[in-house]
Regions:
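Short, charged/polar "capping" segments at the starts of alpha-helices
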Residues: 2-7, 95-96
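Active-site-proximal specificity loops/subdomain of glycosyltransferases
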Residues: 6-52
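Short glycine/serine/threonine-enriched helix-capping/active-site loop
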Residues: 23, 86-91, 200-202, 206-208
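Conserved glycosyltransferase catalytic-site signature
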Residues: 42-47, 65, 73, 154-156, ...
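Conserved catalytic core of nucleotide-sugar-dependent glycosyltransferases
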Residues: 50, 68-174
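Short beta-strand-to-loop acidic/aromatic patch adjacent to the donor-nucleotide binding site
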Residues: 55-68
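C-terminal catalytic/acceptor-binding lobe
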Residues: 147-148, 153-155, 175-241
């Protein structure tokens, strides 16, 4: 109590240090020196973070997102109820543009809307309403459930919910080890457990644009998992060397 949150104290001293690493089997061999390591993927990493978080409100955000100022986030979740989840639409920005406008500065959250503006939510909106619950979902054909659960395109860059909500749905499905769709699936689980998803474009989040590999072998299959297929040890490394 009274201590500063660790992530509030993190600053990138030199933005030029941001690099792209191409992870290959040879690179992994070099880094690990051949030592067996626990299998890891995005969903497991997120779940480990959720299980280790200590607050009542847990925010899951991607590494390549510039989040809003803390005071804006604090205002956003004041009316968030247990069982519900908030997702924010992102706005893409180029790394070169960040360097051009800010150089090595890292305290830039308040300036982002001034420099880059704010996209209207319609730019990423997937359904014509900004919330979804189980009653509405069950009125839709099953083929539309994925779109209805997403609400906005790229819904998973910022999701916030009460700790009890994350634990009720057992986090992200840990068998979805590839790219895409696990964020929509976690929102589907919230909806089908009786909660609702609320989507907004405020406060504003900005995503550092990057290359993508959405080939079939790197992409999850769309699925709807409720109840969760995760076991009671979700969010832990189940691996013995």
């Amino acid at each position: 109590e009274g201590k500063k949150i660790v992530t509030d104290e993190l600053h990138l001293e030199n933005r030029d240090k941001l690099c792209v690493f191409h992870v290959t089997p040879d690179l992994v061999e070099k880094i690990t020196n051949g030592t067996p390591t626990p299998p890891m993927c995005e969903v497991l990493a997120k779940n480990i973070g959720i299980r280790r978080a200590t607050g009542d409100i847990i925010c899951c955000v991607n590494l390549d997102v510039i989040v809003p100022p803390r005071e804006h986030i604090d205002l956003m979740y004041q009316k968030l109820e247990v069982g519900d989840m908030i997702t924010l639409t992102k706005q893409d920005v180029e790394l070169e543009d960040l360097k051009k406008h800010f150089g090595d500065k890292t305290d830039i959250q308040h300036l982002m809307p001034v420099i880059f503006g704010v996209w209207p939510i319609q730019k990423r909106l997937m359904i014509p309403i900004l919330s979804m619950n189980k009653e509405l979902m069950l009125k839709q054909p099953e083929d539309n459930h994925h779109v209805c659960a997403s609400i906005i395109q790229a819904c998973g860059d910022f999701q916030i919910a009460h700790r009890k909500t994350w634990y009720e749905i057992r986090g992200f499905e840990e068998d979805m080890t590839r790219r895409l769709y696990h964020d929509t699936n976690v929102q589907y689980k919230v909806i089908m457990s009786g909660g609702k998803i609320l989507a907004s474009n405020t406060p504003h989040i900005y995503h550092i644009e990057h290359e993508r590999n959405n080939t079939e072998e790197n992409t999850n299959v769309i699925k709807h998992s409720y109840p969760s297929t995760n076991d009671e040890d979700w969010g832990s490394i189940k691996y013995t060397i």
